């Protein structure tokens, strides 16, 4: 191999390693068997969710995972691999891909990483069932408001009882 090709591959490894380090979550999939239309729909859905999706050679992914400190992740780089990176929303890639697997049998989740920790296929699928950030915040808000609401109802009931007795 020429030195130019080796330098280009080393640059790719560095770039992918940086993406892996910066990513809030990474999902590795086997997209073999997807039709062009399905692939286009998947990529559009991921892009709309702020997720970057790339098909990358396993040799480059393996070296990048080693550089990023995700050595255990290289076990999933067998067969054709595509990787979804999300820098902001931890749940987005898992949710979009898991939802898409329900309509496209050819897409298979292989594994991934969540906030720098290697995760199994099952953990990625469990992550996909969680609500997104907005959903979690609204759930937290309703839990925090419940005690205040109960106190307000109790005060109102006491006030009504005193008015009725007077």
Swiss-Prot record:
UniProt keyword annotation of NADP present: no
Domain of life: Bacteria
One GO term of the biological process aspect: translation
Pfam families cross-referenced by the UniProt entry: Ribosomal_L10
Sample GO molecular function, one term: structural constituent of ribosome
Keywords: Ribonucleoprotein, Ribosomal protein, RNA-binding, rRNA-binding
Entry GO terms, CC: large ribosomal subunit
Keyword set includes Transmembrane: no
Entry-linked HAMAP family: Ribosomal_uL10
Family: Belongs to the universal ribosomal protein uL10 family.
Subunit composition and interactions: Part of the ribosomal stalk of the 50S ribosomal subunit. The N-terminus interacts with L11 and the large rRNA to form the base of the stalk. The C-terminus forms an elongated spine to which L12 dimers bind in a sequential fashion forming a multimeric L10(L12)X complex.
Stored NCBIfam families: PRK00099.1-1 (NF000955)
Physiological role: Forms part of the ribosomal stalk, playing a central role in the interaction of the ribosome with GTP-bound translation factors.
Name recorded for this polypeptide: Large ribosomal subunit protein uL10
Species of provenance: Streptococcus pyogenes serotype M18 (strain MGAS8232)
Gene name of the record: rplJ
């Amino acid at each position: 191999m020429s030195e130019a090709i080796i330098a280009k591959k080393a640059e790719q490894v560095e770039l992918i390693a940086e993406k892996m380090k910066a990513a809030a979550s990474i999902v590795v999939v086997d997209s073999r068997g997807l039709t062009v239309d399905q692939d286009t729909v998947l990529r559009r859905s991921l892009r709309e969710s702020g997720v970057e999706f790339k098909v990358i050679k396993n040799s480059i992914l393996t070296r990048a995972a080693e550089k990023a400190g995700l050595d255990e992740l290289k076990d999933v780089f067998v067969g054709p691999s595509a990787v979804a990176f999300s820098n902001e929303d931890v749940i987005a890639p898992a949710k979009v891909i898991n939802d898409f697997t329900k309509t496209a049998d050819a897409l298979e989740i292989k594994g991934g990483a969540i906030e720098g920790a290697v995760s199994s296929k099952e953990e990625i699928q469990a992550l996909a069932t969680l609500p997104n950030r907005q959903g979690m915040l609204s759930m937290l808000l309703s839990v925090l408001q419940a005690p205040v609401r109960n106190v307000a109802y109790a005060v109102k009931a006491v006030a009504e009882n005193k008015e009725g007795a007077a």
